[in-house]
Amino acid sequence: MSVKLGIAPIAWSNDDMPELGGDTPLEQCLLEASQAGFIGIESGGKFPKKSEELIPKLNEFKLNLCSGWYGANLRKNTLEDEKKVIQDQLKLFKDCKAPCIVFAVVAGSIQGDPD
């Protein structure tokens, strides 16, 4: 059985707490992930949100988008609203051939209410 390894960018910077690696450039994250032997990386806050920008950036470091995270707030929004909001990310993931998306309900968490 073959295994493909991917990593999350939280190993370099934390989207929820920017004081933890917020000054680390995306290019450093991608370079070091590639140098460490990973072929995939999750999306993160520093990643371009348009496929025409993201795909060349990933290709530059010989990486693929392997997954990513979507934080839904189903306490405040309806499921129909969340389905509308996630569409841009789904298109990006489809364009990048990402095999999965992590759907998380963030109500009451630092992601859903950082204050």
What residue spans do the PLM features occupy?
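Active-site groove signature of glycoside hydrolases
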Residues: 93-115
